[in-house]
């Protein structure tokens, strides 16, 4: 995680989960060195002053698309809470949280539920961002509203994974709409 800002207003936290490896790509598969959500998170962090925290599974997800899909289905069926490696100690200093993930089977991966339930988000402004192959935002807004009933929610954004490398203008426009970029 990048260190918190020493001066100025409460910093923004950009917390995201991303998986490199074999990914869906226009009906086929492609191997990614950097996951799509991380690519978009980097575009955001290049544009605004924020603290960046990458959510990582204690038991990493496989590089194989099929194995990851199967594990995700099991986790969703079991309502699992995968353990996060190196969970940050606190989010108290943040008023705004940009919460990023891929969409797996129409919702954020279950590790995002682990993260959401690990902290008190009361009064914090949450702006979800996701990358997807088919489902757009899926049930992202509903999922987080259920997990974080005491949080406030701003605009979400969904970026197609296949186009994420060209999404700089999308990141800039979204950050302007939510008031984080002048």
Segments from the language model and where they lie:
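Hydrophobic pocket-lining residues within nucleotide cofactor-binding pockets
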Residues: 55, 103, 159
């Amino acid at each position: 995680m990048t260190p918190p800002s020493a001066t100025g207003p409460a910093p923004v936290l950009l917390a995201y989960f991303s998986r490199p490896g074999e990914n869906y790509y226009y009906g086929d598969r492609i191997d990614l060195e950097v996951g799509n959500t991380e690519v978009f998170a980097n575009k955001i962090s290049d544009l605004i002053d924020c603290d960046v925290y990458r959510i990582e599974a204690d038991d990493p997800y496989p590089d194989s698309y099929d194995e990851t899909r199967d594990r995700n289905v099991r986790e969703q069926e079991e309502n699992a809470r995968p353990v996060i490696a190196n969970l940050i100690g606190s989010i108290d200093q943040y008023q705004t949280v940009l919460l990023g993930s891929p969409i797996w089977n129409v919702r954020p991966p279950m590790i995002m539920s682990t993260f959401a339930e690990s902290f008190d988000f009361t009064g914090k402004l949450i702006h979800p961002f996701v990358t997807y192959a088919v489902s757009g935002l899926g049930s992202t807004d509903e999922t987080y509203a259920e997990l974080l009933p005491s949080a406030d929610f701003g605009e979400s954004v969904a970026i197609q994974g296949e186009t994420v490398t060209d999404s700089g203008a999308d990141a800039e426009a979204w950050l302007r709409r939510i008031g984080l970029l002048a």
